[in-house]
Amino acid sequence: MEKHKNISMAVIKRLPKYHRYLEELMKNEVDRISSKELGEKIGFTASQIRQDLNCFGDFGQQGYGYNVKELYTQISAILGLDRGYEAALVGAGNIGQAVSNYSRFENLGFKITAIFDANPKLIGMKIRDVEIMDIDEMESVLEEHKIDIGIICVPRKNAQVVADELIRGGVRAIWNFAPVDLVVPDHVKVENVHLSESLLTLIYLLNESES
């Protein structure tokens, strides 16, 4: 994957949406699309789309628009989807099981190869053919396998300890579902998924629309 520096986080967070819509267009056998048409589907302006894509290169042709398949391939490469990623999930409760069971991740080259939990009732069970292991085995498993991403689905009181152990095991990216902000070294990237914050935002918008 080619490195792109000084790209704003706002632009980066819009790329997955472009990727998803382009995939839908390919499934519908759409060969090309203009920035205006793409913007109408996604909810962005044509100017915004052109500015975002120009951060990564010269895409599209004036008077022609974008070749859907080519743009999808290019955005896939920008996102790093031209290689596979192995993940370890810690916490096989309701959220952990839901994440583990989501089949679309494998289509993106993202595979959960290890699942850990401290609950004896869960240890030995399988989720999509991956056996849940005792969390005490995590250190040795991380030593034996190259795990790219750690997924934290444990209670907040345990999240930092789990993050520390994942990092010691060589994990450089963490997808955090625990309702706590983790403290990690600069070289480790964290993406938080705080469900309650998303719900509170929705509740605010609901009340604003009714006032």
Curated annotation (Swiss-Prot):
Gene Ontology CC annotations of this record: cytoplasm
DNA-binding span(s): 17-56
Localization annotation: Cytoplasm
Binding-site residues for NAD(+), renumbered to this chain: G91, A92, G93, N94, I95, G96
GO MF term list: DNA binding; DNA-binding transcription factor activity
One GO biological process term: negative regulation of DNA-templated transcription
A UniProt-annotated Pfam family: CoA_binding
Keyword annotations of the record: Cytoplasm, DNA-binding, NAD, Repressor, Transcription, Transcription regulation
HAMAP family registered for this protein in UniProt: Rex
Described purpose of this protein according to its UniProt entry: Modulates transcription in response to changes in cellular NADH/NAD(+) redox state.
Subunit record text: Homodimer.
Family membership: Belongs to the transcriptional regulatory Rex family.
Listed name of the protein: Redox-sensing transcriptional repressor Rex
Organism: Clostridium beijerinckii (strain ATCC 51743 / NCIMB 8052) (Clostridium acetobutylicum)
